[in-house]
Amino acid sequence: MTYLLIAALACERLTTVAVPHAVVTSAQSVAAGALAEFNTLPALCRVAATLTPSPDSDIKMELWLPAANWNGKFQEVGNGAFSGSIALPAMAAAVRRGYAAASTDTGHTGNTAGFALGHPEKVIDFGWRAVHETAVAS
């Protein structure tokens, strides 16, 4: 077996990993250049998960793991202001440099603060917990 095939098999098995307050929703091997919007990426393992550290939490995250030439480092990338989206372009830049990269939607979608009204736990998710939980789950 080649290294990339072994890495692909290991990637698919990440859906069975038990992570506190998390459900791994997908883990798929992505061939080099296969993501249309990021066609210069090397082969990677793309993992998606939902984190629920509180009953009101609904934090989405992705983790991209280089299939080869990992530099041994992890980089979590952020998003700006009230942005509730996973920062895929920043993750792609990190993976191109050999990093394992992760990002979170900070527990909401969209770019307004409406998610926070009447949801103090979501404010905590946005303020710090989503980033922390993403790093821990990664």
Q: Over which residues does each language-model region extend?
A:
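Positively charged n-region of N-terminal signal peptides that target proteins for export
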Residues: 1-4
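Catalytic-loop region of hydrolases
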Residues: 6-73, 77, 89
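Cap/lid segment of the alpha/beta-hydrolase catalytic domain
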Residues: 80-137
